[in-house]
């Protein structure tokens, strides 16, 4: 039997896609999972067990769509029992709750998963994938949802002498009265430092890149406040430090480690420092070793991710797709495809892309009257409750297409996919399209949000909307394959964009002008 779709990995992304395929019921599919449980990654990681994906059951709203803005852990489902907020009220949950949630999700959705089926090889013969996992499975399409499953190790002589994040001890008493170097400046490094501050005599964090704060960049993979206690101990002269520079070499003797640094911001070219322990917390990468030469995907970003098209397909292997954290290659350190609260929507979009491409199924759309009022009302209603555009800012869009008197509203379309492929159907050859996104201002990550001397535009002021730095709706009018006009809705402290004179009336006027061909 040749499957329509074979999914490798039963983590959050693999389960999300499987649940969509199961509910749709039109495709033969199977999920292969090497472990005995779904979501096995979370049984080990993060090592210190606290997730940094927020969980807020108490939102003041009974709208499940709106509430997903503050629920970063749930997968998409119509079953209210499968909301992660039912599992714990902790704002930063324990990873064991995620393991339990994913097991329940797999069981209650009835997805087809083969556990204990670790994939050892993938090849492609005459256009069909052959996947070896004890036995051989054949599939027309393969979706890789394995996550970043191998440690990313920088090229440092002697790095093999150090301890890895994956298997280092996490009991702080194991580091009592020791000097510790942590290589890395991401959340895993700071999470580790935070855990060891009470028992070590000194901790240094080292890396060539600047520490970037998530509250400034709006990228949730940058350093989160929940992990940044270490910064206090550094800047308040409490024994610890951050070393900005490159580790040149690591050696080890009976008394510990000697580490050679080349500093980025100091006068000395190199310096040697002594440590009792060296821990490597430099993140993870995609493991492409299972693919043979017939279908080995091209890699990108220091070979950490597969290179992908706007359809999350391998750039060099047709019909090989990716789902989950691997898809952050398309918006690396810019949006949220590296995280559940982002890629759950990307997986739903991928399912629609696959059905459109292989099943000749149009993107779901609601018909509207082709008037400024009708289109603006639909846009206003959506931007005030959508979680997808909220979480996947500047990456996913709602798209309203207009062909004469026929307007259609399409939800959650990848911006790059629409730009390249469009949404035309045999009965809807549109001339105009309105692409609706939520976006920050172009230099939002250059502004200190806590600096009261920084001038900001006033909220709810129509004439200043285009200068807004904070998240706000943007509507772009496309005609003839290019953007011909842009309209910004004024930012608002409560993220409500529905004031008649501030948001609604200007948007109606913009759409009407565009439909008349007058532009912006």
Question: How would you describe each model-predicted region?
Answer:
Residues 20-78, 219-221:
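N-terminal FAD cofactor-binding segment of flavoenzymes
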């Amino acid at each position: 039997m040749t499957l329509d779709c074979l999914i490798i990995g039963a983590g959050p992304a693999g389960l999300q896609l499987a649940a969509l395929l199961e509910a749709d019921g039109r495709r033969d599919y199977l999920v292969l999972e090497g472990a005995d449980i779904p979501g096995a990654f979370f049984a080990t990681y993060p090592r210190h067990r606290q997730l940094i994906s927020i969980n807020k059951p108490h939102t003041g709203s009974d709208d499940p769509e709106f509430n997903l803005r503050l629920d970063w852990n749930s997968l998409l489902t119509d079953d209210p029992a499968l909301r992660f907020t039912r599992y714990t009220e902790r704002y930063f949950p324990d990873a064991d709750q995620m393991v339990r949630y994913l097991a329940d999700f797999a069981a209650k959705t009835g997805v087809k998963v083969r556990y204990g089926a670790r994939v050892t090889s993938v090849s492609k013969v005459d256009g069909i994938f052959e996947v070896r996992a004890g036995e051989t499975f054949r599939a027309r399409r393969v979706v890789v949802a394995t996550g970043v499953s191998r440690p990313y190790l920088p090229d440092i002589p002697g790095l093999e002498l150090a301890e890895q994040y994956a298997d280092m001890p996490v009991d702080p008493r194991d580091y009592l009265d020791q000097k510790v170097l942590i290589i890395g400046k991401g959340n895993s490094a700071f999470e580790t430092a935070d855990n060891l501050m009470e028992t070590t005599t000194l901790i240094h964090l080292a890396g060539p890149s600047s520490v970037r704060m998530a509250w400034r960049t709006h990228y949730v993979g940058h350093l989160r406040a929940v992990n940044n206690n270490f910064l206090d101990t550094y800047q308040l002269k409490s024994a610890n430090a951050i070393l900005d520079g490159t580790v040149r070499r690591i050696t080890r003797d009976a008394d510990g480690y000697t580490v050679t640094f080349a500093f980025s911001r100091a006068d000395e070219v190199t310096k040697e420092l002594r440590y009792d322990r060296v821990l490597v917390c430099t993140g993870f990468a995609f493991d492409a070793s299972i693919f043979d030469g017939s279908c080995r995907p091209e890699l990108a970003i220091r070979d950490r991710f597969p290179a992908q098209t706007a359809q999350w397909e391998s750039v060099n292997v047709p019909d090989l797709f990716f789902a989950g954290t691997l898809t952050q290659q398309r918006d690396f350190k810019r949006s949220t495809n590296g995280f559940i609260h982002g890629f759950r929507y990307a997986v739903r979009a991928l399912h629609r892309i696959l059905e459109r491409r292989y099943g000749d199924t149009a993107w779901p759309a609601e018909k509207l009257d082709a008037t400024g009022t009708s289109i603006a009302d639909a846009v206003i209603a959506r931007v005030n409750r959508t979680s997808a555009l909220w979480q996947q800012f500047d990456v996913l869009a709602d798209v309203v297409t207009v062909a004469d008197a026929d307007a259609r509203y399409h939800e959650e379309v990848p911006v790059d996919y629409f730009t390249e492929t469009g949404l035309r159907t045999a009965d809807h050859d549109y001339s105009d399209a309105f692409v609706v996104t939520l976006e920050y201002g172009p230099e939002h990550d250059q502004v200190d949000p806590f600096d009261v001397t920084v001038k900001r535009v006033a909220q709810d002021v129509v004439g200043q909307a285009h200068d807004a730095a904070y998240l706000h709706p943007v509507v772009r009018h496309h005609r003839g394959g290019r953007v011909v006009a842009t309209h910004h809705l004024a930012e608002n402290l409560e993220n409500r964009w529905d004031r008649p004179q501030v948001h609604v009336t200007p948007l109606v006027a913009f759409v009407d002008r565009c439909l008349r061909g007058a532009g912006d």
